[in-house]
Design a protein with these regions (language model features):
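Short, amphipathic alpha-helical interface elements at domain boundaries
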Residues: 2-46
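Long, charge-rich, low-complexity alpha-helical segments
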Residues: 29-202
């Protein structure tokens, strides 16, 4: 079994300029490396051994002038990583595949539509570029996502009720709903606002 992680919460504007994430109804302030770990896991399902490398790539994208290597801030990373789990800002499950992880984590989620202000679009650009997307392609986040039009009616429903369990219990095709939600999440159209319950296998 592999352990897969993703980020929880909705990035919020903060009057003091702090990095604020809302999980459920609670606002939580992130600082230092916490910010980069959270962003490295946002809109993706990442196997545990890949997380540190993704975070380093994100740091390189944001601070290209700094000399970063494979040992950069490892102790700080471990501390911040554990802290994010404790604070409910990242969640995990144990599955064999990324697809199984997406279904496991999303089925208990409450999701929210991404309201794409300039700050969020910039974060999406940084995350995409850090994951190896060519610069010109990463810039596409500043354009309207075609899938927002394709799934427009469903997204309007999400704005009223983001509880995934509700849609799974009121449809004859729950697997298709989960696949659609996974696609919308990984296309950076949805946030996971919170998770009601996650069963974690030991």
């Amino acid at each position: 079994m592999m352990r897969w992680y993703t980020a929880v919460g909705v990035k919020m504007e903060h009057l003091g300029g702090l990095f604020c994430v809302q999980v459920g109804t609670e606002n939580k302030i992130l600082s230092g490396m916490e910010i980069f770990i959270w962003n490295a896991l946002l809109w993706s399902f990442v196997e545990e051994t890949q997380i540190y490398g993704r975070m380093v790539q994100l740091l390189k994208a944001v601070f290209p002038e700094k000399d970063l290597d494979g040992k950069t801030g490892k102790d700080e990373f471990n501390f911040c990583f554990r802290r994010l789990i404790t604070r409910g800002l990242i969640i995990f499950c144990e599955c064999e595949t990324e697809k199984e992880a997406a279904e496991n984590l999303l089925q208990n989620a409450i999701v929210a539509r991404v309201m794409r202000n300039s700050g969020e679009r910039f974060l999406m650009f940084c995350e995409s570029f850090a994951c190896g997307t060519p610069f010109w392609k990463a810039l596409s986040v500043f354009k309207k996502e075609p899938m927002e039009e394709r799934y427009g009616q469903f997204l309007l429903k999400i704005e009223k009720c983001g509880e995934v369990r509700y849609y799974l219990e009121t449809t004859e095709q729950p697997n298709e709903i989960l696949e659609m939600l996974s696609l919308l999440y990984q296309k950076k159209i949805l946030f996971i606002r919170s998770v009601k319950e996650v069963t974690i296998e030991s």
